[in-house]
């Protein structure tokens, strides 16, 4: 959360404020960005699936218009969420990241997972409700760990087949039922590269709205084993010197922060700011 942006449950029946429009193609933008006067946005010919009040930005209420499909709006275009993460105002990215998570949840929870009937939006909390089942569905958050494995002046980096060509990153994976974050870390490192770790140190967390992860970041020391890459998950993995690193993840990601923080400490450089 930032001083400019705070989340809140707002009643869509209230008037005024700002709004963002999200479709399967991304967020609607114009020359001024992705936040529009709400009254103007609702006058456009948009295929609205639902509307949610999501918080306040610079003191103004903000609403999400979740759309069934993209619509041409004069002077506007559609832009994916990752583009906002990589460049531009990080506070706006936080608004849109939250909006994307709420939009995904609202789209996926229109019907009860137990009986199949339509669910209704609760006005006073972030939940969808099935009256026959007395069942509430809340926005999904998927906890996952992300870890930089270290060995003195070397760090273990890997690349997935899904990565941008040449980029290496830290190891990561989702927590399983019954696991602590530390249990998940040990298992995922063992599964992905077949090495063991020790001295696990928590560093920080980051919301990762692609679509609904909570990344718990760690440093861990190498304890033994030879790298054996997990088929289909890891395309390459190797040890890199802190003096000679490959192309790395985006600067606003916790993956990049874990790397930059360790390198700064080893080289005696200034500690980087956390991407919060």
Swiss-Prot record:
Keywords: Hydrolase, Magnesium, Manganese, Metal-binding, NAD, Zinc. GO terms for cellular component: cytosol. A divalent metal cation 2 binds at residue 188. The keyword Hydrolase applies. It is an enzyme of class 3 (hydrolase). Pfam families: NUDIX, NUDIX-like, Zn_ribbon_NUD. CDD domains: NUDIX_NADH_pyrophosphatase_Nudt13 (cd03429). Its EC number is 3.6.1.-, 3.6.1.22. Substrate binds at residues 82, 125, 138, 206-213, 255. Residues 139-262 form the Nudix hydrolase domain. Its cofactor is Mg(2+); Mn(2+); Zn(2+). Zn(2+) binds at residues 112, 115, 130, 133. Divalent metal cations. Mg(2+) or Mn(2+). Binds 1 zinc ion per subunit. A divalent metal cation 1 binds at residues 172, 192, 233. InterPro entries: NAD-cap_RNA_hydrolase_NudC (IPR050241), NADH_PPase-like_N (IPR015375), NudC-like_C (IPR049734), NUDIX_hydrolase-like_dom_sf (IPR015797), NUDIX_hydrolase_dom (IPR000086), RNA_Hydrolase_NudC (IPR022925), Znr_NADH_PPase (IPR015376). GO terms for molecular function: magnesium ion binding; manganese ion binding; NAD+ diphosphatase activity; NADH pyrophosphatase activity; RNA NAD-cap (NMN-forming) hydrolase activity; zinc ion binding. It catalyses: a 5'-end NAD(+)-phospho-ribonucleoside in mRNA + H2O = a 5'-end phospho-adenosine-phospho-ribonucleoside in mRNA + beta-nicotinamide D-ribonucleotide + 2 H(+); NAD(+) + H2O = beta-nicotinamide D-ribonucleotide + AMP + 2 H(+); NADH + H2O = reduced beta-nicotinamide D-ribonucleotide + AMP + 2 H(+). A divalent metal cation 3 binds at residues 188, 192, 233. One of its GO terms (biological process) is NAD catabolic process. A motif (Nudix box) lies at residues 173-194. Homodimer. Belongs to the Nudix hydrolase family. NudC subfamily. NCBIfam families: PRK00241.1. HAMAP family: Nudix_NudC. This is NAD-capped RNA hydrolase NudC. It comes from Pseudomonas putida (strain ATCC 700007 / DSM 6899 / JCM 31910 / BCRC 17059 / LMG 24140 / F1).
